[in-house]
């Protein structure tokens, strides 16, 4: 298996963070990202870049982190006993975008690299990541385009790649206590190393580079759609699902908290405003009801199974 080039991965991730921030600033037209660099006592650090109160984006956070440690945390070794007793290095770019307009979906993307070392043994390494979309008032054309872009970037790596990682995304971003998906999915992959370093790195780069080209057209199409208090209230209510998932189920959040990561950066994904409502039920045949009946469940958006 080819030897991992951690410096090349880090260089790509830093460049990706810069390009995504520049692209989001262009889409917003008003807001700018403030950079906040930090160091981790146990080793490593990163830079959090946050845009708040923009014209289009209520809050957008794009975080780069590169942390090292003497021992893998419990969240990483729970199902992988071979990692116990190894030092680790983890780096990645993670982002969450919360738009102002309820007709614009929230989105999340992440690309990451882990390597665990032990004297006298080969390193254990893998790539992970993906991107997903969380609409409040979904438009089928947006969802289909989102999945078509995900499908197309996977094609050079094999016919089975998109269906596999699309299914994994549906399964991962699922809230069992609500019996619904967090959104309409996209791609999710982890433990990627079986094709060697170069090929695995190429795929991670394709996912990272494919995020903004998939999200930008949706932003341009929906950012000026008129909305009222009813739509805003529903958006804030649905944002609650984002909070529930991230604090209860998300492995990245748990990993960050268990490794002494920077809390502000880890919780950067939280929406700036959110509301809960007891026993909420959408009005029958409403746009809000359509989200529940037609979108918050796994679906073959590209009709590949026909």
Swiss-Prot record:
Any one Gene Ontology BP term: protoporphyrinogen IX biosynthetic process
The residues the record assigns to binding substrate are 94, 110-112, 260-262
Q: Which UniProt keywords apply?
A: Cytoplasm, Heme biosynthesis, Metal-binding, Oxidoreductase, Porphyrin biosynthesis
Molecular function GO terms recorded: coproporphyrinogen oxidase activity; metal ion binding; protein homodimerization activity
The site annotation (Important for dimerization) covers 177
State the InterPro entries in the record.
Answer: Coprogen_oxidase_aer, Coprogen_oxidase_aer_sf, Coprogen_oxidase_CS
Q: Which GO terms describe its cellular component?
A: cytoplasm
Enzyme Commission number: 1.3.3.3
Record-listed a divalent metal cation binding positions? 98, 108, 147, 177
Look up the record and name the pathway of this protein.
Porphyrin-containing compound metabolism; protoporphyrin-IX biosynthesis; protoporphyrinogen-IX from coproporphyrinogen-III (O2 route): step 1/1
**Which portions of the sequence form the region Important for dimerization?**
242-277
Q: Does the keyword Metal-binding apply?
A: yes
* Co-factor(s): a divalent metal cation
Q: Where is the active site?
A: 108 (proton donor)
Q: What class of enzyme is it?
A: oxidoreductase
The similarity comment for this entry is:
Belongs to the aerobic coproporphyrinogen-III oxidase family.
Provide the function of this protein.
Involved in the heme biosynthesis. Catalyzes the aerobic oxidative decarboxylation of propionate groups of rings A and B of coproporphyrinogen-III to yield the vinyl groups in protoporphyrinogen-IX.
* The name this protein goes by in its record: Oxygen-dependent coproporphyrinogen-III oxidase
**Species of origin:** Shewanella sediminis (strain HAW-EB3)
Q: Lineage of the source organism?
A: Bacteria, Pseudomonadati, Pseudomonadota, Gammaproteobacteria, Alteromonadales
Q: Which gene encodes it?
A: hemF
């Amino acid at each position: 298996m080819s030897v991992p080039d951690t410096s090349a991965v880090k260089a790509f991730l830093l460049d990706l963070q810069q390009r995504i921030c520049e692209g989001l600033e262009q889409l917003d037209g008003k807001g700018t990202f403030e950079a906040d660099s930090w160091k981790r006592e146990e080793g490593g650090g990163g830079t959090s870049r946050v845009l708040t109160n923009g014209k289009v984006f209520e809050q957008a956070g794009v975080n780069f982190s590169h942390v090292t440690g003497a021992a893998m945390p419990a969240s990483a070794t729970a199902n992988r006993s071979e990692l116990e007793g190894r030092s680790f290095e983890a780096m990645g770019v993670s982002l969450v975008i919360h738009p102002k307009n309820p007709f614009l979906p929230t989105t999340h993307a992440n690309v990451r690299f882990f390597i665990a070392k032990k004297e006298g043994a080969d390193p254990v390494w893998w790539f992970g990541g993906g991107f997903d979309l969380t609409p409040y008032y979904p438009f089928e054309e947006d969802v289909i385009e989102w999945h078509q872009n995900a499908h197309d970037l996977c094609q050079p790596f094999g016919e089975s790649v998109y269906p596999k990682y699309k299914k994994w995304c549906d399964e991962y971003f699922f809230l069992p206590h609500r019996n619904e998906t967090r959104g309409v999915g996209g791609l999710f992959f982890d433990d990627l190393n079986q094709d060697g370093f170069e090929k695995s790195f190429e795929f991670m780069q394709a996912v990272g580079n494919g995020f903004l080209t998939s999200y930008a057209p949706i932003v341009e199409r929906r950012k000026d759609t008129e909305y009222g208090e009813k739509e805003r209230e529903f958006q804030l209510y649905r944002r609650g699902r984002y909070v529930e998932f991230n604090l209860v189920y998300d492995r990245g959040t748990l990993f960050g908290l268990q490794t002494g990561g920077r809390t502000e950066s880890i919780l950067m994904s939280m929406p700036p405003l959110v509301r809960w409502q007891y026993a909420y039920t959408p009005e029958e045949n409403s746009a809000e009801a359509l989200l529940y009946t037609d979108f918050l469940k796994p679906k073959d958006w590209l009709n590949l199974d026909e």
